[in-house]
Amino acid sequence: MLKKYKMGFDIWAMVVFLIIMIPNFIWSAVPAPNDILRTESATKVIDTIGSIFQVLMIFTLCVFINPKRKKLSFTKTIIAMICCCVIYYCCWVFYYLGVTNWLVIMGLTIPPCMAFLFFAIDRKNYISIVPIAIFTVCHIVFGVVNFII
């Protein structure tokens, strides 16, 4: 499978990562009024596994390039990725307005993962699907266990 890819650097993968991380950078510097995300996690092992696969996800998205991918354009998958980012940003707005219900928590959890998945599919970067899937599962478990149940 690796033979189908070349090693390089996909600047757009890094751009997508940074766009998704901007609210996290803001959150690190400016706490929300009802900041439940700063509580101690009950899923530390899952969080560690998730962090490892998040790094692998970004690494595989940025480094492995499928030469058969098309030029980046507004395909259905890129539009889906953008929609996921918009939903994610909207959920951050609600979070900063003090809304911390299950819908907002899942909105902070699932859409960014789906954005990475749609980007990977569009770029034909199938190597990154496994780390994205594992990171997504860990991210959902973290959100559900720590903030919903």
Residue spans of the language-model regions?
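Membrane-interface helix-boundary motifs at transmembrane edges
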Residues: 2-8, 66-75, 122-129
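Alpha-helical transmembrane segments of multi-pass membrane proteins
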Residues: 19-32
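Membrane-interface helix termini and inter-helical loops of multi-pass transporters
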Residues: 31-43
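Short aromatic-rich membrane-water interface segments that cap or initiate transmembrane helices
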Residues: 40-52
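Hydrophobic, membrane-inserted alpha-helices
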Residues: 57-60, 87-88, 110-119, 135-139
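C-terminal halves and exits of single transmembrane alpha-helices
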Residues: 79-101
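Membrane-helix boundary connector in multi-pass membrane proteins
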Residues: 94-104, 114-131
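Terminal transmembrane helical module of multi-pass membrane proteins
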Residues: 124-149
